[in-house]
Amino acid sequence: MSMRTEYCGLVTEHLLGQTVSLCGWVQRRRDHGGVIFIDLRDREGLVQVVCDPDRAEMFATAEGVRNEFCVQIKGLVRNRPEGTVNAGLKSGKIEVLCHELNVLNASVTPPFQLDDDNLSETTRLTHRVLDLRRPQMQHNLRLRYRVAIEARKYLDEQGFIDIETPMLTKSTPEGARDYLVPSRTNAGQFFALPQSPQLFKQLLMVANFDRYYQITKCFRDEDLRADRQPEFTQIDCETSFLGEQEIRDLFEDMIRHIFKTTIDVELDATFPVMPYSEAMARFGSDKPDLRVQLEFTELTDAMKDVDFKVFSTPANAKDGRVAALRVPKGSELSRGDIDGYTEFVRIYGAKGLAWIKVNEKAKGRDGLQSPIVKNLHDASIAAILERTGAEDGDIIFFAADRAKVVNDSLGALRLKIGHSEFGKANGLVHAGWKPLWVVDFPMFEYDDEDARYVAAHHPFTSPKDEHLEYLETDPGRCLAKAYDMVLNGWEIGGGSVRIHREEVQSKVFRALKIGAEEAQLKFGFLLDALQYGAPPHGGIAFGLDRIVTMMAGADSIRDVIAFPKTQRAQDLLTQAPSPVDERQLRELHIRLRQPEQPKA
């Protein structure tokens, strides 16, 4: 008989009366009245093994096994006794009567129980091998595998070709910091690990491969958050001879296919499309969570002449904004709740949080409860009530500051209230999946510190045709053929139509204050390629880690990556990064300089 004939979790009634050979780990060993029960676990699940003292040698071995021992058992599949069926297990109607038990490898006492749900992340990542044995982690990584497989199936059927691009490439420091790799054979020179295969996939379109994809690692040396890692995985795609709408349709269908085939979720037949300007005006975010049924109300123009300087000063500032967020039934919120929200918005740069409770709308200002009402004239109060559509029992929150602070703080408050217990109880958040496309992004953003424009996405994104003239006259007005796919407040994919003409690419470089010599030095290979009849092309990249995190309902992408880094970009399992010896540094012509210690 083979070492293993079945997976533990797949032993069911169809094997009744048969002898099976199983391999796995001891989840739990229980001694009940002279009979030993072993819950045996493998990647497919659990099966109950019964060790009877009638087989003395086998029973003696069973007495010595402990949790996480790796064992092989051979035995007979039989029905469980009446009243002992476990409906929570696929194998819950049967058990295996053990005939032979072999310890393949003993285990030291594990540092934690695998069913402990209160482990610190440090413990989990330090002992990642054991952590990965837990059913939830097994589920997450198998889900990740299925998502990747379904993406490949769809793209293969659509004529895409899987082509690998280099991991050692040229550093082009535009945006996030590169991970640099010193070259031993070219002293003083460095490769960079790719932040994306962007330029290579464009070159593949020029090279007539028409439709490309790969599921690939990308690297960014940036500060980490719950949804960021220094190395992450993209489903990276590029296609020729398709317009923006056709590209969106193609990949919208791919995401629908993946969700249906992996978790049996039917996403909307057509994803709504929202311009960037509308998303910012209504939600303060370019990745709005449409499950939350709260929106901003614009009040900037109505607050220009009020005596309340907290409102009028930003209302009259060039980059200022005054916006309101009406919360239905929000009068139920206590002063403690409001104080908590006030402290919360300070995290996002807000100086405070003004509010008005609407007790009796018909009474006008006399029916309002707020410390700010006395500072507002009748016309401004009327504008607030009319524009917000406030009703008795509502509360209205206000943000007034630079537009970015208003958008960040009030946008975060919108999500916090919507997803709170209060929000759930009052229907302010809907369940399910709410996808959309956000389009018409600004082509450039102005960097005050460097006094120049920078690319909002990357410098290879095509401007909208009707905005080409603005590249040289008014870059700030230029909109891009860029699009992000957003799902439940997460950007899961982003892409654009690319620039395919050399003269347009050169104009974009000039708008970014990248001179001809610098452009040739950094991107000469691209500019040269665009002169050889480059086709119209565009593409998109999806964050595999983010998609799987959402599907799995995980708290962090670290829960869907086998061996992730911490928020300090460290691998606690292997203790990377780590020092290297002096000989290796000499071979790379590198001398370390100790970082300066802060002055006392």
Curated annotation (Swiss-Prot):
For this chain, one GO molecular function annotation is: ATP binding
Please give the Gene3D superfamilies that the UniProt record associates with this protein: Bira Bifunctional Protein, Domain 2, GAD-like domain, Nucleic acid-binding proteins
* Location of region: Aspartate: 198-201
Q: Which superkingdom?
A: Bacteria
Q: Which reaction does it catalyse?
A: tRNA(Asx) + L-aspartate + ATP = L-aspartyl-tRNA(Asx) + AMP + diphosphate
Annotated residues for binding of ATP: 220-222, 229, 491, 543-546
Q: What is its EC number?
A: 6.1.1.23
Q: Is ATP-binding included in the keywords of this UniProt record? A: yes
The answer to whether the entry has keyword Transferase is: no
| Cell location | Cytoplasm
Query: What keywords would UniProt list here?
Result: Aminoacyl-tRNA synthetase, ATP-binding, Cytoplasm, Ligase, Nucleotide-binding, Protein biosynthesis
Q: Name one GO cellular component term.
A: cytoplasm
Kindly list the residues the record flags as site (Important for tRNA non-discrimination).
Answer: 32, 83
Q: Which residues bind L-aspartate?
A: 174, 220, 457, 498
One GO BP annotation is: aspartyl-tRNA aminoacylation
Q: How does it assemble?
A: Homodimer.
**Into which family does the record put it?**
Belongs to the class-II aminoacyl-tRNA synthetase family. Type 1 subfamily.
Functional note? Aspartyl-tRNA synthetase with relaxed tRNA specificity since it is able to aspartylate not only its cognate tRNA(Asp) but also tRNA(Asn). Reaction proceeds in two steps: L-aspartate is first activated by ATP to form Asp-AMP and then transferred to the acceptor end of tRNA(Asp/Asn).
Q: What is this protein called?
A: Aspartate--tRNA(Asp/Asn) ligase
Organism the protein comes from: Burkholderia lata (strain ATCC 17760 / DSM 23089 / LMG 22485 / NCIMB 9086 / R18194 / 383)
Encoding gene per record: aspS
